[in-house]
């Protein structure tokens, strides 16, 4: 069974997924960051593939991507860094990146290397659902790689039902149609959106991302979905701690408790 499906079959609530950008703040820290996060009890990890034009990302993750590219991070190097990761790490690993670098690598080769490396899923924010259905789905399924689709408050019920029917793993609920970044709490409008999706009784579990940074936002996300994805907050802490994942993770976990 794919590790993503395994996770959601054994844990239905309070799942914590952490995002970081490969190659930030240092080029060589990718594997060690993953190992530390697993040790700290994180349930799933999203590894960002840096790209020069990350349209869905806020200033924090844009800055991380720019620095990672300057450091020399590439998709090929990322796969090289992860080639032995499954000797030590058991939790699901998901790559998050834009279509451009993935297509330069070659989508078939990309999915095959994901399987060989032990990557369980891929989030591609700028992959149109129609293209996924017509071209990419069968290639990914052949390699047992889950393609995770995003929905926003503006996504129609019809589209959400289609995504739920034709994907497997989890649905990434973007808390707002804006770019990523921390929020102190979720307003009534956002909570109504979370509840509306929960009431649809979808087949796939849902994870809420964009704006999770403290106990309040994490608990709200967990009340309406299987858990939360935290990116900008952790990337900021990694930067502040000069790449010390141990300290950054401790500070994040502390923020989620108080």
From Swiss-Prot:
Active site: 46, 57
Keyword list, A-Z: Amino-acid biosynthesis, Aromatic amino acid biosynthesis, Lyase, Tryptophan biosynthesis
Example GO molecular function: tryptophan synthase activity
Cited SUPFAM superfamilies: Ribulose-phoshate binding barrel (SSF51366)
InterPro entries listed in its UniProt record: Aldolase_TIM, RibuloseP-bd_barrel, Trp_synthase_alpha_AS, Trp_synthase_suA
Subunit record text: Tetramer of two alpha and two beta chains.
Task of the protein: The alpha subunit is responsible for the aldol cleavage of indoleglycerol phosphate to indole and glyceraldehyde 3-phosphate.
Family: Belongs to the TrpA family.
Protein name (record): Tryptophan synthase alpha chain
Organism: Phocaeicola vulgatus (strain ATCC 8482 / DSM 1447 / JCM 5826 / CCUG 4940 / NBRC 14291 / NCTC 11154)
Lineage start: Bacteria, Pseudomonadati, Bacteroidota, Bacteroidia, Bacteroidales
Gene (UniProt): trpA
